[in-house]
From Swiss-Prot:
Binding site for substrate: 91-93, 230-231
Underlying gene: queF
Pathway per the UniProt entry: tRNA modification; tRNA-queuosine biosynthesis
Residues given in the record as NADPH binding sites: 93-94, 259-260
HAMAP family: QueF_type2 (MF_00817)
Active site, UniProt feature: 191 (thioimide intermediate), 198 (proton donor)
Name of this protein: NADPH-dependent 7-cyano-7-deazaguanine reductase
Amino acid sequence: MNKELESIYQNIANQSELGQTANYDSYYNPKRLYPIPRAPKRQEINLDPNSTTFYGFDCWNHYEVSWLNSKGKPVVAMAVISYDCHSPCIIESKSLKLYFNSLNNSTFPDVETVVQTISKDLSYCIGSEVAVNVYPLSDIPNQTIYAAFDGVCLDKLDIECSVYHVMPDFLSTSSELVEEVLYSDLLKSNCLVTNQPDWGSVQIIYKGKKINHEGLLKYLISFRNHNEFHEQCIERIFADIMRFCQPESLTVYGRYTRRGGLDINPIRSTEPCAFDGQNIRLIRQ
């Protein structure tokens, strides 16, 4: 990371509440939300922030949502939050947790008001429309928990690993043309600011020259001591595969384990992709 980027993210560390002891609000406080611009990290990996050559979204699931109804009785719920990958900013995850905590002792007349409030606040924070669904526990649709992504699991490959900082040079292709769906549960990186571990699974769907599976797995494992936010890691994987393997089409989908009741699930693709049907839940989630 160059010195300019280091300065930007040091300012984030100083101004946000990441890595700091936080005070919890007793009542609704949208000022707890903290945006992080996407552009600096995209410039680092040569991904044009204004490009329309990639698509995708970020999906968050929140399992610890609560507020008071008009009679002061608590309501507990789950929330699904999604927004386009071309939003100017992402939401800093701890700030989102603190924002939701500020709802705990706040009164709302109905679920619709909660949804409207959250959508308005998050949209203002990131400078783009945010879709929000809130499900009281009694209204949550039946949800299948999947043991793994669809596709061929790379993790069964018997490889030696010794590089734990991102090494895209592991990526290579043969001349054989294929369409493949691959996945790994070995994705691990660290928070850019706090160094806390982020655990995830990643699915790679592509068409083009066959990517060497051993090299791809070594590449994914090389994120192990890398410091970046979830969304940035998935974009880096997408950008590196596009650069080093040059597939005709590519989709990279990451699903991370939760922290503070929140899990983050970014998807990036060369093809337009709708959110509907994509928010599957894996066994570690």
